[in-house]
From Swiss-Prot:
Belongs to the uroporphyrinogen decarboxylase family. GO terms for biological process: protoporphyrinogen IX biosynthetic process from glutamate. Catalyzes the decarboxylation of four acetate groups of uroporphyrinogen-III to yield coproporphyrinogen-III. Transmembrane segments: none annotated. This is Uroporphyrinogen decarboxylase. It comes from Pseudomonas putida (strain GB-1). Keywords: Cytoplasm, Decarboxylase, Lyase, Porphyrin biosynthesis. It is an enzyme of class 4 (lyase). Substrate binds at residues 27-31, 77, 154, 209, 327. The gene is hemE. Pfam families: URO-D (PF01208). One of its GO terms (molecular function) is uroporphyrinogen decarboxylase activity.
Length: 354
């Protein structure tokens, strides 16, 4: 494989020295970009975009052609695993993701297969290798998956949910059944991420979007325990380099100390945490990724720069920080404002890496 021309993202995750703070954005390939909207129209719909490696590669690279980002992230969806388990993922306009089949009984869980990354999710592996080839060493490629708890909520609720009542009821009424589901998902996520690493992903992130909706005890039992299990089964070195792992629990700021013990290299932070406090709490155990409120991008350019400066100052001197938003960039953001954000990170962070 081609040598990396820009490896500061990987270096920061491993707490190695960098010249400036690296930056990328969750959902950086997305609807805020007119070129993404054109590709999606050409593909026909969201799933066709995900399932065609050429289209997935095209949209993954679009933000890199526009901005000096320090990493690319695979364009895909977190629900590819439940879809490969036979649940029939589809998207309703204005409704978000839905499943044709819903998991409601222990028998449903028993019947679920563990997908084979090559056979059942080959289109994702093909996308990873295509993107990696097209990147030609420009920046590292991030692979990703949803966390077992987050995937389970969609499978049990049948789609998005405000209160996760069916999944939480299962946690209290029939924890054995939920543990079986989470265990199958942990096995599936481990082999899926390892497949992405072997196909060319140079770092991986686990998105625990809904872990922060659990009580402290339930988070430990039903979310963190399974992420820990995944991390322990991941390929951590490939092509002569370490493959860093990032865990991101949205609204997980209360539990940073225990997440830092899960074995990952970095923790993603949402914008409700103060990054300087988070750094003091986790010490030197892990790098931190985040954590500007995505809606700051609706403000004027000078306000965006001020918030970038504030977050950089809060983190302070030295490496171990990957700048990102605290969640995905939203569709109505002006692409010019995203550019202001990215340039500000590089420009204003050099003083912290003397």
């Amino acid at each position: 494989m081609t040598a990396l021309k820009n490896d500061r993202f990987l270096r920061a995750l491993l707490k190695q020295p960098v010249d400036v703070t690296p930056v990328w954005m969750m959902r950086q390939a997305g609807r805020y970009l007119p070129e993404y909207r054109a590709s999606r129209a050409k593909a026909g719909d969201f799933m066709s975009l995900c399932m065609n490696p050429q289209f997935a590669c095209e949209v993954t690279l679009q933000p890199l052609d526009r901005y000096p980002l320090d990493a690319a992230i695979l364009f895909s969806d977190i629900l590819t695993i439940p879809d490969a388990m036979g649940l029939g993922l589809y998207f309703e306009t204005g409704e978000g993701p839905r499943f044709k089949k819903v998991i409601s009984t222990p028998a449903d869980i028993e019947a679920l297969p563990i997908p084979d990354p090559q056979k059942d999710l080959g289109y994702v592996m093909d996308a990873v290798s295509t993107i990696r080839r097209e990147l030609n060493g420009r920046v590292p490629l991030i692979g990703f998956s949803g966390s077992p708890w987050t995937l389970a909520t969609y499978m049990v609720e049948g789609g998005s949910s405000k209160d996760f009542r069916k999944t939480k009821a299962m946690a209290y009424d029939n924890p054995q059944a939920l543990h079986l589901l989470l265990d199958k998902l942990a096995q599936s996520v481990t082999s899926y991420l390892n497949g992405q690493i072997l196909a060319g992903a140079q770092a991986v992130q686990i998105f625990d979007t809904w872990g922060g909706n659990l009580s402290a005890a339930a988070y430990q039992e039903f979310s963190l325990a399974y992420m820990r299990k995944i991390v322990s089964g991941l390929i951590r070195e490939h092509e002569g380099r370490k493959v860093p792992v990032i865990l991101f629990t949205k609204n997980g700021g209360l539990w940073l100390e225990s997440i830092a013990e899960a074995g990952a290299d970095a923790l993603g932070l949402d914008w409700t945490c103060e990054i300087g406090d988070a750094r003091r709490r986790v010490g030197d155990r892990v790098a931190l990724q985040g954590n500007m409120d995505p809606t700051v991008l609706y403000a004027k350019p000078e306000a965006i720069r001020q918030e970038v400066a504030r977050i950089l100052a809060s983190y302070g001197q030295g490496t171990g920080h990957v700048f990102n938003l605290g969640h995905g960039i939203t569709p109505e953001v002006d692409p010019e404002h995203a550019g202001v954000f990215i340039n500000a990170v590089h420009e204003l962070s050099a003083q912290y890496h003397q």
